[in-house]
Amino acid sequence: EDGMEYPMLTADSGGSPGYIGLLGHEIGHNWFYGLVGSNETYRAFLDEGFTNFITAVSMDSIWGQGSATQYEKWYASKFYPRKSRKYIRNDLRYMRFARSGFEVDPLNTHSDYFNEYSNYRLVYSKTASMLFNLQYTLGTETLNKVMQTYFSRFLFQHPYPEDFIKVAEEVSDKKLDWFFHQWLDQTITLDYAITDLKSLKIDDRHFAKLSLKRKGKMEMPLDIQLTLQNGETKMVHIPNQEVNQKELPESWYTAKRWVGWNSFNNTYTVDVPVSSPVVKAQIDPSGRLTDIYRLDNVSGTIPPINWQSDNMYVYYPTLDAYDVYLRPTFSYNKVDGFNPGIHWKSGYMLDDFYNQYHSEGSIRYRTASTSPEVSFFFETPIDFLGELTHVFTDFNYTGLYESFEIGYNTQIAQGIDLFPYHDIQVSIQTSKLNSSQYTPEWQSWEFGQVQSLKLSHGYYWAKGESTGDYIVDIETSINGSDFNYNQITLTTINNLTFFLPLDIRTFSGWQSGSVPSQVSFRLNGASFFNTVQKNWFYSGVGIFPDDFTENSHIHSSGGGNIRSEYIITSPLKWMTAINVQTNPSSFLENLTGYDKVIKKLKIQPLVFVNWNYFKNISDETETIFEAGVGLTRPLTIIPPSLGEYVIRFDGAVPVWGKDAEKNWVFSLEKTF
């Protein structure tokens, strides 16, 4: 959905149910920028952020805590999570970006001067989060008076940030420079932790000994809920200023003031009188404090865990719990047949670039064997090594092979959305063949332990609608390996936009020593080891007709990407390949029946040419050049969490190459 606001008019796109929030936001602009004329080009947070805040408050009041997820289709309404507008548009978006470490511009920045678009987008989410934190600090009733006074005082006027701050201090009768300086002028984050909770008994009186730590640089007053053994709860307020910022109920206990900022005085302990032994403590049960790591906001050694079914489409992480998604899974191969099992995906606030305690894997029962099929992957960020740096481990055990890899990955970038950026990965991997009966006859695998050091460097660029990436992979055997070899490959992919889209891929590889056949790069596609790691191929060997596999009709993208029938039995010393393809749809749209058949079926035609020049182990060089056409259709029926799949048929005719024959191939993945 997309929309634009005008006084007494909104222009909106999209459909149900997403348009509800969009419409609410654009209508909200009639108050903030329409009636209260803040200058969006100067300080956008007064416009977009205030509108985001009132949109969340109004929508959550009208539709409840599922206001942002009004699903209508059966599957979505049954299995998708229900979330509030406050969560979707404010808390989640701000917290994810703040956790990345790339928030470099404070809210109090001219709209034209933000480092990148993602930093600018914080004027929406972070501002609304700031106002919810102000509500938490002053109390809901006081903040309502602040907003009403600000609105009425600057109706049809042009206020600036200092005007709102002055109103907030006047209405609340509190000095709030400490609050607004943190939220508007800095990029520091809020992160508190409960480090210890003990139950004490002194002279027949019960006390809760509570220890806290401020891990982030931002300071805020704290509301903490204590749960007692007798079932009662007690609220504790820890002020950070000389005077409480809000009125508290008489039943609340006001603890001593916690004075501290940045790393100064970042620990705190208090003894709270209670009526019964304490069993649990929780920071901010209202969920308004934008603490970027809430797993330690609850006492105990094991953090809260949210067990839920995996709908395979939409994931909204729980802000105050570790998510575990479960679903059934299965695999199929020609030896074991059907292998049922369970798949899990877990982590804290998972996203595309910062995955904390991310674990994913499956356990399947092999019907023809006593041992299970197991896959396990784990990664977590290591912040002291730099933004977007993760360590990872990957383990696989199947009837065909077993492998284990451990390493680290880091991205070097100027921002989340900024190009170019670099991706560097270093790992150690070990693998071995368990049984050759799982592979098709044309695949050559060798028994023995393969142990290697792997280095990878990727460079990614974008300009306009064109994108590209260049990836260098280096692999060398290490002690303990039964094979002594070295391998270097360079892969480039450039997706260019002219009058027709033009995709150009190049592959260059060099290898020496006793390269295991399953690791060796190939003319027709990816290496055998990389191929069997693709679930669709591993299962397809038993599902597709024998003619498909025995005659190379199944194409695994990679390597030289040749589609004509050209099988070599000896290893290659080096290879250079160029793959060029284009989608000629714009030329075909005027053909009779194109819209009714090709376009309606969502089929994408491709025209491609491939050139390969290589040397085999006998020092013989050969060249093959082919051309062909293909048809590709997205398999949208498969949930995106299972991967991006297509149905692809390519037909190739050799133009030059003495041993090549025309051929057709089938695949469930794109060429590149």
Indicate where each model-derived feature is located:
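Outer-membrane beta-barrel initiation region
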Residues: 232, 270-273, 284-384, 414, ...
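Solvent-exposed beta-strand/loop surfaces of large extracellular or lumenal domains
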Residues: 232-267
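Outer-envelope beta-barrel architecture signal
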Residues: 322-326, 336-340, 353-359, 372, ...
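C-terminal outer-membrane beta-barrel translocator/porin domains of Gram-negative envelope proteins
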Residues: 330, 387-399, 403-410, 421-427, ...
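Outer-membrane beta-barrel "beta-signal"
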Residues: 628-629, 661-672
